[in-house]
């Protein structure tokens, strides 16, 4: 997501844009994120990292894109514990509130997904609750203007994590309590089961939203749409289809 945001900023504003990117991890000598003016390394929850962000461009920002996410996946959203949700929120949601409070920023853009489709309800775990928190925040009035890009399945840390956990669990399909998931792995290799699981997501997305197989180019186009409209709340992208909406996806309506 961060790459798509940077590319869209450069397309819209050219070299005039002054961009800082925060890389969640240890500093690697010689490594810089392409397209930005400054790369900052470290955990966004580290006070020193926040102070460095405040020192950039006199602490004034037109737009902040918050794409960092880390939380438990691979289990049903309904089975996420309060502890796992709190841990997921620590990096996936809570920093958004902190940054909005501490920075002088006009617009904050966060990211979500279609976590209420059947396949995601079965596997998105605590991250599903963090994404719901983001969507509820998106429709609230705040110090900054709020917006959210909601995307269909694409290759990401979360999707890789889900596949890795399912691959391990697939060795004993009887332990998969969800009948839909279990059907993908019974009598099949873990590789084949994962493939069928992904195909199931794509099929469900296409039936629900009109397209599927979201690519890096699609994410880039969604960011360009963000700049095109005056005050969008949700910019949805699923495959080549991009559309606006203004209501959050609430888990209570689907669980």
Predicted regions and their residues:
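Catalytic loop of short-chain dehydrogenase/reductase
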Residues: 87-89, 107-143, 150-182
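Conserved catalytic-core motifs of eukaryotic protein kinase domains, centered on the activation segment
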Residues: 32, 74-79, 119-122
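Canonical Rossmann dinucleotide-binding motif of NAD(H)/NADP(H)-dependent dehydrogenases/reductases
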Residues: 1-20
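NAD(P)-cofactor binding segment of oxidoreductase domains
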Residues: 50-55, 82-106
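Rossmann-fold cofactor-recognition segment
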Residues: 21-27, 31-49
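C-terminal helical subdomain
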Residues: 94, 148, 167-251
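Conserved mid-core segment of classical short-chain dehydrogenase/reductases
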Residues: 69-86
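Conserved NAD(P)H cofactor-binding loop of Rossmann-fold oxidoreductase domains
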Residues: 64-74, 112-113
